[in-house]
Curated annotation (Swiss-Prot):
UniProt-listed Enzyme Commission number(s): 2.1.3.15
Subunit structure: Acetyl-CoA carboxylase is a heterohexamer composed of biotin carboxyl carrier protein (AccB), biotin carboxylase (AccC) and two subunits each of ACCase subunit alpha (AccA) and ACCase subunit beta (AccD).
Name the UniProt record assigns to this protein: Acetyl-coenzyme A carboxylase carboxyl transferase subunit alpha
Entry GO terms, CC: acetyl-CoA carboxylase complex
Keyword Lipid biosynthesis in annotation: yes
Family note: Belongs to the AccA family.
HAMAP family assigned: AcetylCoA_CT_alpha
One MF term in the entry's GO annotations: acetyl-CoA carboxylase activity
Coiled coil: none
Main location: cytoplasm
Lineage of the species this protein comes from: Bacteria, Pseudomonadati, Pseudomonadota, Gammaproteobacteria, Enterobacterales
Keywords, sorted A to Z: ATP-binding, Cytoplasm, Fatty acid biosynthesis, Fatty acid metabolism, Lipid biosynthesis, Lipid metabolism, Nucleotide-binding, Transferase
Length: 319
């Protein structure tokens, strides 16, 4: 896979370009009387070392860029890599099927679970079809329908959060966007089955919270979770989106800060360079965390599960 490098990764990109050039030359003329392999090996080691150095000291704005990386794995990528027998379910049974939310039944190590997550899309047509991962009310109503189905069949619910936010269009507001989000928040707090939520990319405002009320809330290492985007915050406070890096630092949008505030439970480490560098390894780490969380929640009674979830929600906002 050809990698897209972000601005802060340009030194790495330059090294990788040299490696690609040398590799191409080696393929074109195998009779060259020079040892290219040794030079390629040296450059690869240098690239890994440089990547470690850069990623050891990322700021919040750089993490925000990684969370939005166009090659970052999405919900359906993790479904393919970490689950078996996925059967997608569609529609809210009232208005439409919102493609920005995907959901269905799958097996996690043989155990039936309900999966619900945002899906952004990669190519232009798919991005438009999925509305860039910004759900309308029917998307959240579909999610709630699947959660209620999971409760009826006593299946754990696993959600994957990756959205810039709920769709703010006029049509969405006319169809009750705020009501749909509020209803999900209420009903998720009452569910009688375990709910595990994981932020895999962007966790944008109420659009993220509408599938983010759970017994366990995890974040991938280079994901973000915030009430507004850094650009939106900067536009309000400084009247300029150019102040987004400053806003990102001030807002505390990254996983370590949110864990410090006890808003999330676990940070799932990503492969060196981010989840897009090795989706298979990332999926394996995510799967291990989900299995661990399920084991922790399985021992709780229904009453204990709901009481614990309630206490968790009521503790937000206290230092």
């Amino acid at each position: 896979m050809s990698l897209n490098f972000l601005d802060f990764e340009q030194p790495i990109a330059e090294l990788e370009a040299k490696i690609d050039s040398l590799t191409a030359v080696s393929r074109q003329d195998e009779k060259l009387d020079i040892n290219i392999d040794e030079e390629v090996h040296r450059l690869r080691e240098k690239s890994v070392e440089l990547t470690r150095k850069i990623f050891a000291d990322l700021g919040a704005w750089q993490v925000a860029q990684l969370a939005r990386h166009p090659q970052r794995p999405y919900t359906l990528d993790y479904v393919r890599l970490a689950f078996d027998e996925f059967d997608e379910l569609a529609g809210d049974r009232a208005y439409a099927d919102d493609k920005a939310i995907v959901g269905g039944i799958a097996r996690l190590e043989g155990r039936p679970v309900m999966i619900i997550g945002h899906q952004k899309g990669r190519e232009t047509k798919e991005k438009i079809r999925r509305n860039f991962g910004m759900p309308a009310p029917e998307g959240y109503r579909k999610a709630l329908r699947l959660m209620e189905m999971a409760e009826r069949f006593n299946m754990p619910i696993i959600t994957f959060i990756d959205t810039p936010g709920a769709y703010p269009g006029v049509g969405a507001e006319e169809r009750g966007q705020s009501e749909a989000i509020a209803r999900n928040l209420r009903e998720m707090s009452r569910l009688n089955v375990p709910v595990i939520c994981t932020v895999i990319g962007e966790g944008g405002s109420g659009g993220a919270l509408a599938i983010g009320v759970g017994d366990k809330v995890n974040m991938l290492q280079y994901s973000t979770y915030s009430v507004i985007s850094p650009e939106g915050c900067a536009s309000i406070l400084w009247k300029s989106a150019n102040k987004a890096p400053l806003a990102a630092e001030a807002m505390g949008i990254i996983a370590p800060r949110l864990k410090e505030l006890k808003l999330i439970d676990s940070i799932i480490p990503e492969p060196l360079g981010g989840a897009h560098r090795n989706p298979e390894a990332m999926a394996a780490s995510l799967k291990a965390q989900l299995l661990e969380d399920l084991a922790d929640l399985d021992v709780l009674s229904t009453d204990d599960l709901k009481n614990r979830r309630y206490q968790r929600l009521m503790s937000y906002g206290y230092a």
